[in-house]
C-alpha cells in the first residue's frame, strides 16, 4: 500500500500528458486525505483528459461526510468489483491517472522501517492507475473531488515483494505484498476511455527494471 508520494509541477504534468493549463499546482508531497492532482477523461471533450485537484482518499457516493473514518486512499484491484467504496467508480468507468515524481514504501529487511523511494529509471513521471468520484454534500451543496490509488498483489515481484513489514503468522507466499499499477503513456487513452475489459488488461506489475529504487537519504 502506498501512503506517500510526490506529485509533479503543474507545467510538467501539462507537457507530459498534454493537458491544458487549468489547475495551478506546485510539486508537493501528498499524504492520505490531502489534496493532490489526478487526470481523468474530460466530460466536455470526448477522447481528451483534464487535470483535477482532489482529495487522496475516495469519498464514495453513500458517504454522509467527506471526512471518512476509514481509509480509501488505496484500492485492491482484486476487490474493486465487490467493495462498496469502489465498485461504483469502476462500473461507471471513473478511472484516473495519478501523476507522481516518486512514491515511498517501507522496507523492513533490517528489522526496522527504512523508507525506500521509487522513481522511474527513464526519468519520466509515474502515471499510476486510480479511480475517482465526485461527491456532493446534500446539506451544504459542497462538491468534493476525490481519488484512490489501485494496488495489485506483488508477492512474486522481485522488488516490490521486499516492501512492507512481513506478517510472521503468514507464509512467504501469503503475505499479500502490494504494488502500485503504472500506466504507460501510450496506454493512457485506453485506461481513461476504454472498455472495462481493455482497462483491466492494463492492470499488471511493472518489470523490476522500470524502477529506480533505494533507501531515502536521512
Language model feature labels by segment:
Residues 115-164:
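A contiguous pocket-lining binding segment that forms or flanks enzyme active sites
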Residues 84-110:
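Conserved SET/PR-domain catalytic core that frames the SAM/AdoMet-binding pocket
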Residues 2, 38, 98, 128, ...:
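A residue-level signal for conserved active-site and pocket-lining positions in enzyme catalytic cores
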Residues 52-56, 111-120:
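Short Gly/aromatic-enriched secondary-structure transition segments
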Residues 100-102, 152, 185-186:
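Residues immediately flanking
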Residues 48-90:
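A glycine-rich, hydrophobic loop/mini-helix early in the fold
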Residues 1, 13, 73, 155-218:
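C-terminal accessory segment of soluble enzyme catalytic cores
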Residues 1-57, 196-201, 207-211:
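Extreme N-terminus nucleophile/cap motif
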